[in-house]
């Protein structure tokens, strides 16, 4: 009977130790998988668990070392969910991989990224984002046509300009030889300062193109004189660089069809929250844009192919191209 008891792993039997060990191991919390899927604000990231726990005492480190998987929020597909900025999280994840901060030359979301780093409790990343930017090797920031602090609101340095050293006895009003060299063309003739594609002549606004389009309908025939048959515009679309479109149209720009588009990328899926072409023209004009081209196509639909006396319903698609130099 004692042998039978030990075989069954009773507390007083010889197999009790094995049964107790099995019970304790089953009581341990389940481990996280080596490959972790994260849903951050609708953006899905797949990474290794060792990456997200690479910074001790951070928010992600506590989530994936001090908590159990069932305690964390998940989406409908079982991915761990974080209600944060999905676009900026890519830079957080890049930092966690090798603890290095690498940002694009033109990055207007620096302050928002610093706020995300504070949320994820990454003090070293917060410190680096808050420190003044130091010019790296290669061309100076002014030759790359970027902002002083990587922000939309900061002043652009004219291309070819560098801070001249104040020479002893030099007049404060004397022209800088650096500026004189920057204003000359390679052939020796006088020329304006060289510009990057995103910098305008006044050094404060970026150049570029914006195309707005709309699909409209109107009637030609007996009802053409009625007020109800005037131009009808269903939606005004906006195509161009994301940062330019946001600068011109601001809160009147609907980004729902192309969210989290980086500022340096282009899009053709934005549209305006209003339907008045002249309002769009006014906003473009106030921002320094002028029209350089337009095109239109139209089709006609008959109510009956045999009865030509019926009113003709026309639909058209029109695009206007605006430029700021």
From Swiss-Prot:
Coiled coil: none annotated. Keywords: Acetylation, Cell membrane, Cell projection, Membrane, Phosphoprotein, Postsynaptic cell membrane, Synapse. SUPFAM superfamilies: POZ domain. Present in a variety of fetal organs, with highest expression levels in the cochlea and brain and, in stark contrast, is detected only at extremely low levels in adult organs, such as brain and lung. InterPro entries: BTB/POZ_dom (IPR000210), H1_KCTD12 (IPR049905), SKP1/BTB/POZ_sf (IPR011333), T1-type_BTB (IPR003131). The keyword Phosphoprotein applies. It holds the Pfam family BTB_2. Interacts as a tetramer with GABBR1 and GABBR2. This is BTB/POZ domain-containing protein KCTD12. It comes from Homo sapiens (Human). The lineage of its organism: Eukaryota, Metazoa, Chordata, Craniata, Vertebrata.
């Amino acid at each position: 009977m004692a042998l039978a008891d030990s075989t069954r792993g009773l507390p007083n039997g010889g197999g009790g130790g094995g049964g107790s060990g099995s019970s304790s191991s089953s009581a341990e919390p389940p481990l996280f998988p080596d490959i972790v899927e994260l849903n951050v604000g609708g953006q899905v990231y797949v990474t290794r668990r060792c990456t997200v726990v690479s910074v001790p005492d951070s928010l992600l480190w506590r989530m994936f070392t001090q908590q159990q998987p069932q305690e964390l929020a998940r989406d409908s597909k079982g991915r761990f969910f974080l209600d944060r900025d999905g676009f900026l999280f890519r830079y957080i994840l890049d930092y966690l991989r090798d603890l290095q901060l690498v940002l694009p030359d033109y990055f207007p979301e620096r302050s928002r990224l610093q706020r995300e780093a504070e949320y994820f409790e990454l003090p070293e990343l917060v410190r680096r984002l808050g420190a003044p930017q130091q010019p790296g090797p290669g061309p100076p920031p002014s030759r790359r046509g970027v902002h002083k602090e990587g922000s939309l609101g900061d002043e652009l340095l004219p291309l070819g300009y560098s801070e001249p050293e104040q020479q002893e006895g030099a007049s404060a009003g004397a022209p800088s030889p650096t500026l004189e060299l920057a204003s000359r063309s390679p052939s020796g003739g006088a020329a304006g300062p060289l510009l990057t594609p995103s910098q305008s002549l006044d050094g404060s606004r970026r150049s570029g193109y914006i195309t707005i389009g709309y699909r409209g309908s109107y009637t030609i025939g007996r009802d053409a004189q009625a007020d109800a048959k005037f131009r009808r515009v269903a939606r005004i679309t906006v195509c161009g660089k994301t940062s330019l479109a946001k600068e011109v149209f601001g809160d009147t720009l609907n980004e729902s069809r192309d969210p989290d588009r980086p500022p340096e990328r282009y899009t053709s899926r934005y549209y305006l929250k209003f339907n008045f072409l002249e309002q769009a023209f006014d906003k473009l004009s106030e921002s320094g844009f002028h029209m350089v081209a337009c095109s239109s196509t139209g089709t006609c639909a008959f109510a009956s192919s045999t009865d030509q006396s019926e009113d003709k319903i026309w639909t058209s698609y029109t695009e206007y191209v605006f430029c700021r130099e």
